[in-house]
Curated annotation (Swiss-Prot):
Record keywords, A-Z: ATP-binding, Coenzyme A biosynthesis, Cytoplasm, Kinase, Nucleotide-binding, Transferase
Protein name, per record: Dephospho-CoA kinase
Pfam families found in the cross-reference section: CoaE
Domain of life per record: Bacteria
Entry GO CC: cytoplasm
Localization per Swiss-Prot or TrEMBL: Cytoplasm
Gene Ontology MF: a single term: dephospho-CoA kinase activity
Domain DPCK: 13-209
Function description: Catalyzes the phosphorylation of the 3'-hydroxyl group of dephosphocoenzyme A to form coenzyme A.
UniProt feature coiled coil, ranges: none
Family indicated by similarity: Belongs to the CoaE family.
Length: 209
């Protein structure tokens, strides 16, 4: 039975997380397009807080020099990634600069959505940043580690060693699944994935009288 394009929900926040390259964006896009749910994405905020002219970008430039910027003044994310994923201390420093600003973006936009019965917060580092209390339900998008590694290498054009550095910077996906309310298996095709999302949504839908 097909789900309606717009439904009424129990009022809650869903924390959508998973590992790098496991398919969080695929699920988030489906929730937005199929159910018209507001999606607040930490990765989008992470780009916003380092935009040209931002205080966070200036702090990063002060630490790493002008070579951390592209010719147009934007952050060279690839170069920064090669630094922070090779050195946990540098990654911790960067998170100390960016995480408060990202949280402020979430709080700003959540304040505009107070009347929405459900909001999806896409937070890749939900567990690592200790943000479980921000949400009422946690969904983890998962796939086997080998598949995750292959997707990451091909998506971001990384060497196997660089991919391993990025995987090591997050909780293992199996550990995240242990703490999930809902696990979405994204190891097969999108139809399989979306069927699970529909089933999960049914658990939070309030049947209309």
């Amino acid at each position: 039975m097909g789900a309606p394009n717009h439904v009424n929900f129990v009022r809650r926040r869903i924390g959508l997380t998973g590992g790098i390259a496991t398919g969080k964006s695929t699920v988030a896009d489906y929730l937005r397009d199929r159910y018209q749910l507001p999606i607040l994405d930490a990765d989008r905020y992470a780009r916003e807080v380092v935009a040209v002219g931002s205080p966070v970008l200036q702090v990063i430039r002060d630490r790493y020099g002008a070579s951390i910027l592209l010719a147009d003044g934007q952050l060279d994310r690839q170069k920064l990634g090669s630094i922070i994923f090779a050195d946990p201390a540098e990654r911790q420093w960067l998170e100390q600069q960016t995480h408060p600003a990202i949280r402020a973006c979430f709080e700003r936009d959540l304040a505009q959505l107070e009347s929405d019965p459900i909001v999806v917060l896409v937070i890749p580092l939900l567990f690592e940043a200790g943000l479980q209390d921000w949400v009422e339900q946690i969904w983890v998008v998962a796939c086997p580690l080998e598949q995750q590694r292959d997707r990451l290498i091909h998506r971001d054009r990384l060497t196997p060693a660089a991919a391993e550095q990025r995987l090591a910077a997050q909780w293992p996906i199996a550990q995240k699944c242990e703490h999930a309310d809902i696990v979405i298996d994204n190891s097969r095709d999108r139809t399989f994935t979306f069927q699970q999302v529909d089933q999960a949504i049914e658990k939070v839908v309030v049947a209309e009288n």
